Design a protein with these regions (language model features):
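Conserved glycine-rich cofactor-binding loop
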Residues: 31-32
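Conserved glycine-rich Rossmann-like NAD(P)H-binding loop of the short-chain dehydrogenase/reductase
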Residues: 45-61
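Conserved mid-core segment of classical short-chain dehydrogenase/reductases
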Residues: 87, 110-125, 168-171
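Catalytic Tyr-X3-Lys loop
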Residues: 117-136, 155, 179
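Active-site helix of classical SDR
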Residues: 139, 175
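Residue(s) in the substrate-gating loop at a strand-loop-helix junction
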Residues: 159
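Active-site-adjacent segment of SDR/Rossmann-fold oxidoreductases
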Residues: 164, 185-195
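C-terminal helical subdomain
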Residues: 199-202, 207, 218-267
Length: 267
């Protein structure tokens, strides 16, 4: 049966999904930036992609690109802030494949950029949901198609903010620190079922997140000028270059490396 590039989040469509011929990699935040670059790199290396993003328009464009390289690649529109969306996406993935080669938990937001005293509580919680809770929720729901006879490799995208406190970034720092520990816990618990998990800090990448940082102000973010200067000085790294550096770890890290945190600048 023919399969449309984009899947709507409705269970009624599941009966029409043919199984993928090759094991896919699931990439969240795959519609742009680093996630899109990682997904394309994986497709070019011969892996079908299940690309996830909340931006349906950008995801459609990215998905067409991936499908041109690997015909089995598909897209699923899913907002990781919405737990019902996550549940529906997981069901669609399980209907599409009996085993996942890997998951790249790339989706993330930097907002809100505000002090702990002044930040909107709902926005702070939304950051934690997308950057951390959504990772656990999606992975938990996909456990039936992870590991087993073959190793499933899970990669989380870390940040220097996971290691140090940054004024104005409390939600992001907390979420990324939690994500590093989540990867360690996943590695510990997944070992007996051939599931590995690592975290990788990609450095300062030229993405929309950097634009969001530069659109903030010094009152909310004391390090504002530092990031403006990094952009002016051409210090931001192209996502395609970073994706190429991360690729071997994403697809080839060993069970012995599971639980480790890597920094792209040290690879």
């Amino acid at each position: 049966l023919a399969f449309p590039l984009a899947i709507n989040n409705t269970k009624s469509r599941l009966q029409y999904l043919p199984l993928m011929l090759k094991a896919p990699y699931v990439v969240t935040g795959a519609s742009r930036g680093l996630g899109r670059a990682i997904a394309r790199n994986l497709a070019e290396c011969g892996h079908p992609i299940i690309a996830i993003s909340r931006d349906a328009v950008s995801l459609g464009l990215a998905g067409a690109e991936f499908a041109d390289i690997q015909a089995d690649s598909i897209t699923i529109t899913c907002d990781l802030a919405d737990r019902a969306d996550i549940a529906a996406a997981a069901e669609q993935i399980k209907a599409k494949t009996g085993w996942i080669a890997g998951i790249i938990h790339n989706a993330g937001i930097i907002s809100p950029i505000k002090s702990i005293a002044e930040v909107d509580r709902a926005n702070w919680a939304r950051n934690i949901q997308i950057n951390l809770v959504g990772v656990q929720d999606l992975t938990n729901r996909l456990m039936p198609v992870l590991g087993g006879e073959k190793q499933t490799r899970i990669t989380t995208i870390s940040s220097g903010a996971s290691l140090r406190a940054i004024s104005g970034w409390s939600a992001y720092c907390v979420a990324k620190a939690g994500l590093d520990m989540w990867a360690k816990c996943m590695a510990e618990e997944g070992a007996e079922n051939n599931i590995s998990a690592i975290s990788i800090a990609p450095g300062i990448v030229d993405t929309d997140m950097q634009k969001t940082i530069r659109s903030s102000n010094e009152d909310d973010f004391p390090d504002y000028e530092t990031f403006v200067e990094l952009h002016k000085d051409g210090q931001l790294v192209n996502p395609k270059l970073v994706a190429g550096q991360l690729g071997p770890l994403i697809t080839g890290h060993s069970m012995e490396q599971s639980g480790m945190r890597f920094d792209v600048r040290e690879l």
